[in-house]
């Protein structure tokens, strides 16, 4: 991960840090849980601020995040949680479909190293897919479809995702190609063939 400046008080990273420093759970309950839990909480908070959680997320989602409790309780809703965890409080799934997300996907997503699924379809995300997606080697599926302003080239680091089975990048402005090394694992891929080359799609 690249170094991050916290001097800009409006940056998602600084906002996440300020929130954690004012959150009793972050300061008290996590102090005996080790660095991994602190990093996970920080990464999710950065994601929230980077995708404009306080201003553009749907109200139910907005009120369900940055709670003074375990991250595994965030985003609990009647039809399914935004965040799912393994038994040891490690986040392994994020599902935020049609929830009003805008802004950009932060590089800190790569800190959530146990993610198996990342679903961010039907939102208003822009910018590029961060190259740090390539360190999420446990991913079996991710969907960023119907984010019309998501642009740039598909990261070549996708080649590292040797467990990837499901990929949806349709209805975006992404270009480039899908690494041929994924052909042996992909069971389902939905992309814009006119913009993204794929030998196995």
PLM feature segments, named:
Residues 99, 123, 147-148, 172, ...:
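Conserved "Asn-ladder"/turn position within leucine-rich repeats
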Residues 102-110, 126-131, 151-156, 175-180:
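The feature encodes a structural signal of leucine-rich repeats
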Residues 2-104, 195-197:
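LRR flanking "cap" motifs
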Residues 159-201:
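Leucine-rich solenoid repeat scaffolds
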Residues 83-85, 88-90, 108-115, 118, 134-139, 147, 167, ...:
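Leucine-rich repeat
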Residues 90-124:
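Leucine-rich, hydrophobic repeat-scaffold detector
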Residues 94-96, 116-120, 139-144, 164-169, ...:
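Conserved hydrophobic beta-strand positions in leucine-rich repeat
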């Amino acid at each position: 991960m690249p170094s991050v400046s916290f001097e800009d008080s409006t940056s998602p990273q600084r906002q996440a840090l300020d929130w954690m420093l004012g959150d009793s759970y972050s300061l008290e309950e996590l102090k005996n849980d080790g660095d991994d839990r602190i990093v996970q909480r920080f990464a999710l908070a950065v994601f929230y601020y980077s995708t404009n959680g306080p201003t553009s997320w749907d109200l139910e989602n907005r009120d369900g995040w940055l709670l003074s409790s375990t991250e595994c309780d965030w985003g609990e809703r009647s039809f399914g949680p935004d965040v799912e965890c393994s038994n040891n409080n490690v986040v392994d799934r994020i599902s935020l479909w049609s929830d009003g997300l805008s802004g950009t996907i932060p590089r800190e997503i790569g800190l959530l190293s146990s993610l198996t699924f990342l679903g961010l379809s039907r939102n208003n995300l822009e910018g590029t897919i961060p190259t740090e997606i390539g360190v999420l080697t446990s991913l079996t599926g991710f969907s960023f479809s119907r984010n019309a302003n998501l642009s740039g080239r598909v990261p070549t680091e996708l080649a590292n995702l040797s467990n990837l089975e499901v990929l949806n990048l349709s209805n975006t402005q992404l270009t480039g190609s899908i690494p041929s090394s994924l052909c042996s694992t992909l069971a389902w891929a939905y992309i814009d063939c006119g913009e993204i080359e794929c030998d196995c799609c």
